[in-house]
Amino acid sequence: MPIINQLLHSVKLIPDFVPHSGVRGLLILHGFLGMSDNWKTLGKQYAQEGFEVHILDLRNHGRSFHSEGFSYELMVQDVYEYCKANNLIKISIIGHSMGGKTAMLLATTYPEMVDKLIVADIGPKFYPQHHQSILEGLNTVDFSKKPSRNEVEEILSQYIPDFGARQFLMKSLYWQEPGQLAFRFNLQVFNTKIEEIGKPLPDNSVFNKPTLFIRGGNSNYILDEDFENIKKHFPDSRIETVPNVGHWIHAENPLLFYEMTSSFLK
């Protein structure tokens, strides 16, 4: 087994049939503090469309390896090595938030690999740091006291009032051993390298193939004034809005998200 397959955990979903056009690869990249599990339900739907779906846990997330190194450049190299090791020569990519930034950098660095790109609720611009309260809450959890799941959620609720956001973070909680919970993500590294998350796409990065940006109607991650910058980096792009949802579009309205992405990928 290639070393990258041991380092990067992935969920692989194979279609039940081979379409006339042949099986196409689809890569799905989660957002900051997320993991592949967040995308399994949608992944199964894409597989039913004839895609070979690979949902990755990016470094320092989920069941993938922990490393002191954490940047978009490193994540792109991880994904590139994974694609090479798994014979994913031509792929489409769906990336949400941090995974969307990773997907943008991958597509502009290795455009020959990528057929179509879908970016969910993130733009190529710089984002100021805004995860302080989430990190503060996560750092307040003292696992040496062996808290229960309910106690962990109670601590987080003091810093993260949004129930959906807490449930999203709780998915990364697991039993490290009987009676001992832990987070799967590498909180220690995020504490010191959180500024990496906000970094912009390099100014000269361009991807000329079909690209779909999907933003949440209640989210402020992609604003109308960002359209010009998006078009500069992605000339063959369009920007769609899912009404009445926030940043986690795929979780808040999975049906519409699937319809929009499936139609674009055909």
Give residue ranges: language-model regions:
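Gly/Ala-rich beta-loop-alpha elbow adjacent to hydrolase catalytic centers
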Residues: G95, G99, A103
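Flexible "cap/lid" loop of the alpha/beta hydrolase fold
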Residues: M104-T108, D115-P147
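Conserved alpha/beta-hydrolase catalytic His-Asp/Glu region
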Residues: Q129, S144-L201
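Alpha/beta-hydrolase fold catalytic core
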Residues: M1-L27, Q48-F51, L88-I89, E195, ...
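Active-site loop/oxyanion-hole signature of alpha/beta-hydrolase fold enzymes
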Residues: I14, G43-Q48, E52-I94, E259
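Conserved serine/cysteine hydrolase catalytic core
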Residues: E177-H233, R238-T241
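Catalytic active-site module of serine/aspartate enzymes centered on a nucleophile-bearing elbow/loop
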Residues: S237-K266
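Serine-hydrolase catalytic-loop signature spanning alpha/beta hydrolases and amidase-signature enzymes
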Residues: L33-T41
